[in-house]
């Protein structure tokens, strides 16, 4: 299993020439993704300048608002606010309804009425569907799934374990 190459529409944080690339396939309603979020945030901060982080949606829970949370993040992305919205959605602890999604959008400076309209009209549904299909084509069947420099991370998402894997990847890259 390999992640697909990073493309223009991916959600990327960090320098393109970073020696490390960490890709997360995740879902805003997955309890394991919610638990992993603060660990990944601390790792991103610890490796600032050395790490390029990519988040890819894999809405899988089947809950009513599962895909809608991903759509809300895409609405935010269209306005340059993906990462703040990403944090807001994980802060909701996997519990989303339309009003919570709109509130999250306003918390990051987005227009409530525009967000509500985009979600009700499913303006970003096709984008989320395409991302889900791409993840399936890459062999992703569960969340969270992580790759460090293209190699699947197979351990628990705990800070010391993840940092050890990152350090090994850094050493292997010669950085």
Q: Across the structure, where does each feature detected by a protein language model lie?
A:
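Structural alpha/beta surface segment adjacent to cysteine/selenocysteine redox centers
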Residues: 18, 23-106, 111, 116, ...
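C-terminal cap of thioredoxin/glutaredoxin-like
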Residues: 25-26, 32-44, 103-175
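N-terminal targeting signals for export/organelle localization
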Residues: 1-4, 175
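Short clusters of hydrophobic/aromatic residues that line enzyme substrate/ligand-binding pockets
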Residues: 12-13, 96, 153
């Amino acid at each position: 299993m390999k992640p697909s190459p990073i493309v223009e529409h991916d959600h990327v944080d960090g320098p393109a020439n970073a020696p490390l690339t960490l890709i997360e396939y995740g879902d805003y309603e997955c309890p394991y993704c919610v638990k992993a979020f603060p660990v990944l945030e601390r790792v991103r901060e610890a490796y600032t300048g050395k790490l390029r982080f990519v988040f890819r949606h894999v809405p899988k829970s089947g809950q009513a608002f599962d895909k809608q949370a991903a759509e809300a993040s895409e609405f935010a992305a269209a306005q340059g606010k993906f990462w703040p919205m990403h944090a807001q959605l994980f802060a909701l602890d996997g519990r989303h309804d339309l009003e919570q999604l709109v509130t999250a959008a306003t918390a990051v400076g987005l227009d409530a009425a525009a967000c509500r309209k985009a979600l009700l009209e499913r303006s970003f549904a096709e984008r989320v569907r395409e991302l889900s299909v791409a993840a399936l084509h890459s062999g992703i069947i569960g969340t969270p799934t992580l790759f460090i420099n293209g190699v699947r991370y197979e351990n628990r998402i705990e800070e010391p374990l993840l940092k050890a894997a990152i350090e090994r990847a850094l050493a292997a890259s010669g950085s």
